[in-house]
Structures are given as structure tokens and as C-alpha cells.
Amino acid sequence: MMKMEFGKELLVYMTFLVVVTPVFVQAIKKTELIPSKWLPTVSILVGAILGALATSLDGSGSLATMIWAGALAGAGGTGLFEQFTNRAKKYGKDDK
């Protein structure tokens, strides 16, 4: 396995995970199996799992690094998703 160039590849993987993790969490949310209050935690866990799975890709970091990156991406993805949905709720209909 190649050694990861810490800033470059990690940023690429985290960017991908920030986009993909909310998609998985939204799918989980639609099942209504998990209460909404737990979705941010689920997002972090999903990100960590996806990060762990990404260790099989070329140029990825160690398992610990990728789990850490995935968990951070999951947390960031949730924050980004919430920011846009709350903004849409607040400004969506009033701006027209």
C-alpha cells in the first residue's frame, strides 16, 4: 500500500465522504427505524464505516486515519445538510 500524502488524498476522500454520507443518512431517515434525534450520531457512524471501507482504495491512509476522516466527514456532512435544509425552511417561501 502506498503511503498517503496526508493533506492531498485525505482531503479528496473527506470531500467525497461529506457528499456521500448524507445520502446514506437520508435513506436511513426515510425508513423511520431510527428517531431523528439520533441521525447526527448515525451520520458520524456511517461516515466512519465508509471511511473504513475506503481503506481498500489506492492511496488511502491507515484504517485509523480513514475512520477518523470518515467520522469527521459524517459530522461535517450532517452540518452542511442541516444548514441547507434549515435555510430552505426559513427563506424558501418568504423570498417569493
UniProtKB/Swiss-Prot annotation:
It is a multi-pass membrane protein. Its main location: host cell. Keywords: Cytolysis, Host cell inner membrane, Host cell lysis by virus, Host cell membrane, Host membrane, Membrane, Transmembrane, Transmembrane helix, Viral release from host cell. Isoform Holin has 3 transmembrane regions whereas isoform Antiholin lacks the first transmembrane region. It comes from the Viruses. It is found in: Host cell inner membrane. GO terms for biological process: killing of cells of another organism. Isoform Antiholin: Counteracts the aggregation of the holin molecules and thus of pore formation. The keyword Magnesium does not apply. Residues 1-32, 82-96 are cytoplasmic. This is Antiholin. One of its GO terms (cellular component) is host cell plasma membrane. The keyword Oxidoreductase does not apply.
